[in-house]
UniProtKB/Swiss-Prot annotation:
GO terms for biological process: DNA replication; DNA synthesis involved in DNA repair; double-strand break repair; SOS response. This is DNA replication and repair protein RecF. Recruited to foci following DNA damage; probably interacts with RecO. It is found in: Cytoplasm, Nucleoid. CDD domains: ABC_RecF. GO terms for cellular component: bacterial nucleoid; cytoplasm. The lineage of its organism: Bacteria, Bacillati, Bacillota, Bacilli, Bacillales. GO terms for molecular function: ATP binding; single-stranded DNA binding. The keyword Cytoplasm applies. It holds the Pfam family SMC_N.
């Protein structure tokens, strides 16, 4: 798939912009704080209905406007798909093929993107929350059902935490509702964990040969989804549910004492190992960067395997963060397969073959010129 054109209205520092893209490589050049990252973010938001930079949607709307609009024409194997996302202070509304989607979880998945920005190099050494968000965003692109389950889990988790707070402060003494909320949480938590386990195994399958290639065969990458659950079959929904019930039974008094849910997928993590050693703790910066790059490149093949289309790759000021060898490996891997957007302050360092087939855009103060 590829984006044929994009139109922005009142998005960040863009008053209005219309762009036609090449279906292979598009390079966006400009000084810092001119709007390069905003353009990349707009493509990502069109795809995911949320930003990778902020959870406050109001920041996406131009300061003097009431709403922002992103429109794009996505080309797939079976034809063109117009997409539109309107962001207002009341919320977001998305259209696919001119049809308004009742839920954003139904909207997500029509356009698949992979964002690789400098902060993604912290995927390995960052907090568990960073890695959980990575899993949730990437699984959601290929599984709308997962987004629904995750949203439901977060809703029930919030309700359960609220009730635990009431028990903690003795505003409530009857624990019957806690049992009801626990049963509801367990059912959906099991679904979330199973999907994360399956995704982690798929990601490892694709990331291992990529990592081996970058490390010249010297390193083996393995992934482990880390959860406090103790189950013999990690993909058995009923066994995971039983394990959660047992955990919550043991934690009940401690949860009431603290007023918060102490077990569940919201506390899980993904661990990365290189040659059997935890790369977050013991890996060099080079190994950590190779791991992050391998994971991002693995997503390309994983998404293609799931939906039969290659996603769009967004490289936001990340090439300058990679040494020549890793940069060359990245560009060689995607060449000819994936529509790619690259932002940079200078074309120095980008190989001539990539530039030869690229559409070139210059951005200054929210204005774009091809």
């Amino acid at each position: 798939m590829y984006i044929q054109n994009l139109e922005l209205t009142s998005y960040r520092n863009y008053d209005h912009a219309e762009l036609q893209f090449e279906n292979k490589v598009n390079v966006i050049i400009g000084e810092n704080a001119q709007g390069k990252t905003n353009l990349m973010e707009a493509i990502y938001v069109l795809s995911m209905a949320k930003s990778h930079r902020t959870s406050n949607d109001k920041e996406l709307i131009r300061w003097d406007k009431d709403y922002a609009k992103i429109e794009g024409r996505v080309m797939k194997q079976n034809g063109a798909i117009p997409m539109q996302l309107v962001i207002s202070k009341k919320g977001k509304k998305g259209k696919v093929n001119h049809i308004e989607q009742q839920k954003l979880s139904q909207y997500v998945g029509a356009l698949n993107t992979i964002m690789f920005a400098p902060e993604d190099l912290n995927l390995v050494k960052g907090s568990p929350q960073v890695r959980r968000r990575f899993l949730d965003m990437e699984i959601g692109q290929v599984s709308p059902v997962y987004l629904h389950d995750l949203s439901l889990y977060q809703k029930i988790l919030s309700q359960r935490n609220h009730f635990l707070k009431q028990l903690q402060t003795r505003k409530q003494t009857d624990r019957t509702m806690l049992d009801v909320l626990t049963d509801q949480l367990v059912e959906v938590a099991a679904k979330v964990v199973v999907k994360r386990l399956q995704f982690t195994a798929q990601l490892e399958k694709w990331a291992q040969p990529i990592h081996a290639g970058i490390s010249r065969g010297l390193e083996e990458l393995t992934l482990k989804y880390h959860t406090a659950l103790d189950v013999s079959d990690p993909l058995d929904l009923s066994k995971i549910g039983d394990s959660y019930q047992e955990a919550f039974s043991k934690l009940r008094e401690k949860e009431i004492e603290r007023g918060v849910t102490l077990s569940g997928p919201h506390r899980d993590d993904v661990l990365f190992y290189v040659n059997g050693r935890d790369v977050q703790t013991y890996g060099s910066q080079g190994q950590q960067r190779t791991t992050a790059l391998s994971l991002k490149l693995a997503e390309i093949d994983l998404i293609h395997e799931e939906i039969g289309e290659y996603p769009i790759l967004l490289l936001d000021d990340v090439l300058s963060e990679l040494d020549d060898y890793r940069q060359s490996h990245l560009l060689h891997t995607i060449q000819g397969r994936v529509q790619t957007f690259v932002t940079t302050t200078s074309v120095d360092g980008i190989d001539h073959e990539t530039l030869r087939q690229a559409g070139m855009f210059r951005v200054q103060n929210g204005a774009l010129v091809k």
